[in-house]
């Protein structure tokens, strides 16, 4: 394969894996450790 194709595929895989990790952190099991700033402040 050409170099440009390999670079494009690797950047795409990196972006997809980063997005998957961000979604897992936001909505998966680690999200229980995140604090909610709206619940921290009482009006």
Curated annotation (Swiss-Prot):
- TM region positions: 5-27
Keyword annotations of the record:
Chloroplast, Membrane, Plastid, Thylakoid, Transmembrane, Transmembrane helix
Give compartment(s): Plastid, Chloroplast thylakoid membrane
Gene Ontology CC, one term: chloroplast thylakoid membrane
Q: What is its main location?
A: plastid
Q: Name one GO biological process term.
A: photosynthesis
Q: How does it sit in the membrane?
A: Single-pass membrane protein
Q: Which family does it belong to?
A: Belongs to the PsbN family.
Its function, per the record, reads:
May play a role in photosystem I and II biogenesis.
Record-given protein name: Protein PsbN
- Gene name for this UniProt entry: psbN
């Amino acid at each position: 394969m050409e170099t440009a194709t390999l670079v494009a595929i690797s950047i795409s895989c990196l972006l997809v894996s980063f997005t998957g990790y961000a979604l897992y952190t936001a909505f998966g099991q680690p999200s229980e450790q995140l604090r909610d700033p709206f619940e921290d402040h009482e009006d």
